[in-house]
């Protein structure tokens, strides 16, 4: 089954370039993971003809996972960096990326929620969750 979103859509939405360290393989893996999580939760009719909100939700969830991956790498890097069109200071890179990822993840889950099956698990759609 084909993913609902694409690498191009994730890169465009989050303004992520190849030079940011986000490889095609990384983004495609995050898209596949987001897709698997969404398909396991939404109603069958939404799988065959996904509403725009589900497509955008998948883009946001895949982008959030990509930002978290980049954030983990950048947390170890001491250089100044420019990511998603913003200059990020050395001490703020990791928190800024994680904050952006969390907001995207929450919005993606909110967009997908109306299309979930009534029997969907109560766990969040989030690809990565913070420890509680």
Tell what function each PLM region has.
Residues 65-132:
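Short loop/turn elements at secondary-structure junctions
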Residues 1-55, 103-132:
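Conserved short "hinge" loops at termini or chain/domain junctions
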Residues 32-39, 59, 63-67, 71:
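Amphipathic alpha-helical core segments of compact helical bundles
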């Amino acid at each position: 089954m084909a993913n609902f979103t694409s690498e191009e859509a994730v890169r465009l939405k989050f303004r992520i370039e190849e030079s940011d360290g986000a490889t095609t393989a990384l983004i495609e893996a995050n898209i596949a993971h987001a897709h698997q999580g969404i398909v396991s939760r939404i109603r069958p009719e939404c799988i065959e003809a996904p509403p725009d909100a589900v497509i955008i939700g998948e883009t946001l969830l895949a982008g959030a996972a990509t930002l978290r991956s980049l954030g983990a790498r950048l947390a170890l890097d001491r250089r100044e960096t420019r990511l998603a069109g913003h200059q990020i200071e050395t001490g703020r890179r990791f928190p800024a990326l994680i904050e952006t990822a969390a907001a995207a993840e929450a919005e993606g889950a909110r967009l997908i929620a109306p299309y979930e099956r009534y029997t969907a698990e109560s766990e969040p759609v989030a690809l990565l969750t913070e420890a509680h």
